[in-house]
Amino acid sequence: MKTKTILLSLLCIVGITTATAQSDVYYWKDGKAVKLETVDSLTFNAPEHFDFAAQWVDLGLSVKWARTNVGAAGMTDYGTYFAWGETTGWTSDTNYAKNNFEWTERDVDALVDENLTLLLSRDAAHANWGGSWRMPTREEFQELKDNCTWTWYDDYHHTGVAGYYIASNKPGFTDNYIFLPAGDLFVGPNKPNPKKEHPIGYYWSSTLHTHGYDYAFYLELRDSRCVVDEATSEFGMLVRPVLAE
């Protein structure tokens, strides 16, 4: 019987599923999950360095989505919390209040373009990852909602992290997915509590709300629903970058 041994970096493996005596092995290539055929053994080599920022997922949408949040070490890591329009993450000792902002309501016009979208210079994803990475717009969050299947996990793959497994519904892309961990948020001096009984996730968009200069759109994740809503911009939320080509 012909055998095949595959040497793969540990973090490049998408998943291994077992049914009776057979195993299906997938690896990550060019933003897609690719199935390996006739695999009898695997050898894992730990990489010296893995650039998560370089890993994107093609869900068949208008933009590609990052596998991780800004500041995260992996898919289930929450990453860094940002106030809207700020590019430096705040620490757990910081009070997310308006008097600690770099900007005020009076100069918010200098942060956005004519479409009320954050300038790249004020975009946390672009400032931290560079290249063509940026924060998603309100419309791109809605596109993600409308074209994917969203499955809530209280404990994703026994990591202790709650969040949504989001799989594409687009033909040709249905094996591709991202995971958005529910990391809660900073509200004034109150710190995130992602381990509470009913975790919630909050992700900033780059879109300013039209009815007030101190509000911006965000994606809210709950076990019962996910919605695009608006919130006051000093809240500390997570950022999931998108890649616009």
Question: What is each of the regions a protein language model found here?
Answer:
Residues 20-52:
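Sec-dependent signal peptide cleavage junction
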Residues 47-245:
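Conserved positions within compact, well-structured domain cores
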Residues 1-25:
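Bacterial Sec-dependent N-terminal signal peptides
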Residues 8-12, 37, 60:
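Compositionally biased amphipathic helical and low-complexity segments enriched in hydrophobic
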